[in-house]
Amino acid sequence: GTEQHRHERESIVEGAVNRLTQLNLGDRSLVFGRIDPAGTGERFHIGRLGVWDRNQDPVVVDWRAPVAEPFYRATGREPMGIERRRHFATRGRTLLGIDDEVFGELASADGEREIKGQGALIAAIEASRTGRLGDIVATIQGEQDEIIRAPMPGVLLVQGGPGTGKTVVALHRAAYLLYTHRFPLE
C-alpha cells in the first residue's frame, strides 16, 4: 500500500496494543474490525465488548450494538451506509494482517470492481480444529447475523446439517438478546 496506509496500520497497531494492555483480555483480541460510514469521516472499531474514553465517547463498539450491524451485513449491492469494512487478523495480541473491503463511491474511486474482504473468513475456515467450539464473533456472516439479530418475540427455528454453525449462531443469539434486552429480562 501507500505510505499513508502503512502509517495508518502502525497507528492502529500501537493504539490497539496500548489499550489491550490496559484491558488484559488474555490471548483474545479486543478489536477485530472497523467500519467507516460513508461521507462522515467517522470510524467505528468493532470488538468483543464496548469501551469508552473518559468523555464516554466510544473507542470500541460492542459487536452486538446496532451501529455494528453493517460490519456483518453490508454487501456490494447493499453497503448499508458504509464505505469501508476492515477485518483485523490477530493471534493473541499480535496483528497478523488487515483485510479491507470498500463500497460505493470509494470502490469506484479506487478503481476496484472486485469485492474483497473474505480473507478473515477463509483464514478462520482453514485454521486447525481443536474439537472445541471456536470463537467466531469476528467472522459471523450476513445470513448468520440476520438470525442472531432477529426480533425477540416468537419461536426461531434454525435448521442445517452437521457443522453448519447452528450451535454457534444460537449462542451468539443468546448473547445478543441478553445485551439488547438486558433490562426487560432482569
PLM regions: where:
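P-loop NTPase Walker
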Residues: 91, 124-186
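N-terminal accessory nucleic-acid engagement/regulatory domains that precede
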Residues: 1-123
